[in-house]
Amino acid sequence: MLTEKFDNLVKQLRVLPGVGQKTAQRMALHLLNGRRGQGSALAQALDIAMHEIIECRQCHSFSDDDICPICVDPRRDDSVLCVVETAADVMAIEQAAGYRGRYFVLGGHLSPLDGINADDLNIDQLVNRVKTAPVDEIILATSTTVEGQTTAHFIAEAVRRHVGKVTRIAQGIPMGGELEYLDSMTLSQALQNRS
């Protein structure tokens, strides 16, 4: 629109969720209109994040090191493992401030229509995890979408013989809802009232 470089900046900003053409243009103009220091700081933070944030080799969430701060925290309850779809779900549960166990991030959910099957997720690693480091309970905290429900059922069957108890977070979360978009109170209650 203005220049080729400006158009490229707008195009790159549009890859962010919820950012359309107009919002991307406003963001670009905001950064270029006397806030170039903020733009440079943003670019540097993005560069560092893209190169230095890695996947925790234990839970598969994001980490600055091989093992994330949650996995190395000795105050966490090793007997309970909460299985979620994404690192965003870990953040949502942590912000609800009611869960003190460990996590395991699947890396998505089963979706045959999109060509995503069990081999594309961290399900084998989850089964190996509960075989080598047994837990008393697995909490299945996948989304309440059809794909999330299917994933929860598949995991329950895969781990049932290796775990004392497999539970699902309580219903009451809106059908079709994504965990990362729930308010903290709803998510906290769902974890406390799991069945």
UniProtKB/Swiss-Prot annotation:
According to its UniProt entry, what is the function of this protein? May play a role in DNA repair. It seems to be involved in an RecBC-independent recombinational process of DNA repair. It may act with RecF and RecO.
Q: Which family does it belong to?
A: Belongs to the RecR family.
Supply the alphabetized keyword list.
DNA damage, DNA recombination, DNA repair, Metal-binding, Zinc, Zinc-finger
Its recorded name reads: Recombination protein RecR
Q: Which GO terms describe its molecular function?
A: DNA binding; zinc ion binding
Listed PROSITE patterns: RECR, TOPRIM
Gene Ontology biological-process entries: DNA recombination; DNA repair
Domain called Toprim: residue spans: 79-174
What Gene3D superfamilies does the annotation carry?
A: 3.40.1360.10, 6.10.250.240, RecR Domain 1 (1.10.8.420)
Superkingdom of this protein's organism? Bacteria
Instruction: Cite a single Pfam family from the UniProt record.
Output: RecR_C
Report the stretches of sequence that form zinc fingers (C4-type).
Answer: 56-71
The species this protein was found in: Psychrobacter sp. (strain PRwf-1)
What InterPro entries does this protein's entry cite?
Answer: DNA_Rcmb_RecR (IPR000093), Rcmb_RecR (IPR023627), Rcmb_RecR_Znf (IPR015967), TOPRIM_dom (IPR006171), TOPRIM_RecR (IPR034137)
